[in-house]
Amino acid sequence: MAESVRRLAAPYLTVEPGAPAPGTWEVIAGATPPAGCVAESVTAQGESTVEYMVDHHHRALFHVAPEGDSWVTQSLLRATRAIHRSAANRQGVLFLHAGLVELNGRGVALLGGSRAGKTSFIMASVLNGSGTMVCNDDVSLTADRDGDGVTGTGWPRSISVRLDTLDLLFGRGRADTIRSSLTHPANQTLLSLRESGVEPHGTALLYPWEYADLMNTRIGSATKVEAIVHLSLADSPSEAGMVPVTGSQRAALLDKRVLRLPNKHLNIFGHEPDPDRSQRTRSALQNLPTFAFRYAFRDVRKEVDHLAGRLAEHFPSD
């Protein structure tokens, strides 16, 4: 099981044999929870409910259900990630709803809400040979010690890809083959979201290692952020384009994408942030070159080159 978690966690977290350090949280499967534990559950849209028992006194979290290796592995990874992200939040690390890509070697944070086109854009950039994904949907950011630069770090989270994105980038036949090969257990139930109308485009979950194999690429674990792009999908090609975001607008747009909690679920480990460090990161981000970029979904591969070209104009010394 540890080997399975290691594969899912790479390249963001490492798994090593040995006893946990005193006072650290443990995530346990295959053992009976002791008396006095508190029930905790995670219910994500389109997924089976994952049940835990939590021993707060001894800092232990026990996986209870569902059974089966794939769900146990996913459950252990999710809980481990939540523990680390809560610790990072306490240290003042800032979490944004954003993707992070190295576009022609330059770290670009792509900010946007759900279905803003972040994952499609990053995948298209990789296929174009110009991009390396660090993360596709949520990034943690930390200001450098001098307060000027910012480093973005990814986390081991499955990559949610629209089914029409797979069709667009790979063709319907290969997209069907890709979907049938995916191992995230929630893929067995996610189609219910499209059938119910909750997710009209449909979605599939790829683990990072599956993404790397599919795209024949490496995944970066962290990179310096050199530009911020507020990304959105245009309703028609005529609406596509890129404009700079002025200083007076930057704070408000950035604040819309700040995650108030470090995790979608399992915020039970303490996460009150260091306000000074978090504010330094916000200030550093507001000083970065910032743009709003709208693109037409069907033209995503062409639009990758468009954004890369406009950024190159802004950084002529490169």
Ranges and model annotations:
Residues 41-105:
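Extreme N-terminal, non-catalytic leader segments
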Residues 11-18, 38-40, 47-49, 88, ...:
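Intrinsically disordered, low-complexity boundary segments flanking structured domains
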Residues 121-122:
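Post-Walker A alpha-helix
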Residues 97-98, 102-113, 127-318:
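Glycine-rich, often acidic-flanked micro-motifs
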Residues 17-21, 42-44, 54-56, 93, ...:
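A generic structural signal for short, solvent-exposed coil/turn residues
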Residues 32-37, 71-74, 80-83, 197-204, ...:
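N-terminal start-of-chain detector that recognizes signal peptides
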Residues 116-118:
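Conserved glycine(s) of the Walker
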Residues 1-65, 72, 298-318:
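Long, basic/Gly/Ser/Thr-rich N-terminal segments
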